[in-house]
């Protein structure tokens, strides 16, 4: 059997939808459960799960610490994820990919600029239509900032992120995940549309974070231990069925 390799993005361990599918509400418990599955897959099938070092490893470690996870979680990260720095100088990526990426980024930046301009115009228009008693200039300014500018800036930030960040590689760890996967001929595991989109461009296999645990469980079901447990469960089921028929 060809040994599987996976390169994990931080979202492979932290994705909310994945936790919900697995039945966990706690981030730390969800991370533990996924890492335990990775441990079983490593021991029973030799499946290797890599993490780019230091970028994604540091991101995972800090995420776990910041969310109050105990040292057991970080110990599992250190034990069961293979830390490897991507070879950025030897992995070949065609110039066409970079050409498309630059064009794509330019388009997104222009769209983000358009959102910013709309927000500025909206704020200016709102200000013009408000009463402005000269003797209450300070109170007026505070009112504008509180009731007009604050809300518009909040909407602007959300729209700007959606226009500019969705579907792009916006961090060094994202790029490291793809480079390492390309280097190892491994599949990428993530919950990030930008990584998914550019994995396709690079010819790298992509596994959504929310299906990854189910995939590992499917492997484990067909291990010697899994087959044994399945056989015992079938025997119990058959025994209960025979008892019911006898009654």
From Swiss-Prot:
Enzyme superclass (EC): hydrolase
Keyword Ubl conjugation: no
Coiled-coil boundaries: none
Catalytic activity: Endonucleolytic cleavage of RNA, removing 5'-extranucleotides from tRNA precursor
Residues in the signal sequence: none
EC number: 3.1.26.5
Region Disordered, residue ranges: 223-247
Pfam families, per database record: PIN_5
Taxonomy, superkingdom: Archaea
Alphabetic keyword roster: Endonuclease, Hydrolase, Nuclease, tRNA processing
GO biological process terms held by the UniProt record: tRNA 5'-leader removal
GO molecular function, one term: ribonuclease P activity
PANTHER family reported for this sequence: RNA-FREE RIBONUCLEASE P (PTHR41173:SF1), UPF0278 PROTEIN TK1425 (PTHR41173)
NCBIfam families to which the protein is assigned, alphabetical: PRK04358.1-4 (NF003343), RNA_lig_partner (TIGR03875)
Family per similarity comment: Belongs to the HARP family.
Job description of the protein: RNA-free RNase P that catalyzes the removal of the 5'-leader sequence from pre-tRNA to produce the mature 5'-terminus.
Name recorded for this polypeptide: RNA-free ribonuclease P
């Amino acid at each position: 059997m060809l040994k599987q390799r996976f390169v994990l993005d931080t979202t492979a361990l932290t994705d909310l939808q994945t936790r919900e599918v697995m039945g966990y509400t706690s981030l730390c418990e969800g991370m533990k459960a996924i890492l335990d599955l990775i441990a079983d897959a490593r021991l029973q099938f030799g499946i290797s799960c890599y993490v780019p070092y230091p970028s994604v490893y540091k991101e995972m470690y800090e995420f776990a610490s910041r969310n109050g996870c105990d040292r057991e979680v970080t110990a599992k990260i250190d034990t069961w994820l293979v830390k490897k720095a991507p070879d950025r100088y030897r992995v070949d990526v065609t110039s066409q990919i970079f050409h498309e990426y630059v064009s794509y980024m330019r388009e997104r930046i222009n769209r983000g600029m358009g959102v910013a301009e709309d927000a500025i115009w909206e704020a200016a228009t709102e200000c013009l239509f408000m009463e402005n008693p000269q003797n209450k200039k300070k109170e007026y300014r505070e009112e504008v900032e509180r009731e007009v500018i604050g809300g518009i800036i909040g909407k602007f930030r959300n729209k700007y992120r959606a226009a500019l960040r969705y579907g792009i590689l916006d961090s060094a760890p994202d790029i490291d995940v793809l480079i390492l996967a390309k280097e190892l001929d491994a599949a990428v595991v993530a919950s990030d549309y930008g990584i998914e989109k550019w994995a396709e461009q690079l010819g790298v296999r992509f596994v959504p974070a929310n299906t990854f645990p189910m995939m590992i469980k499917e492997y484990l079901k067909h291990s010697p231990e899994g087959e044994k447990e399945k056989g015992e469960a079938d025997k119990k089921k058959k025994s209960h069925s025979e008892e019911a028929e006898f009654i």
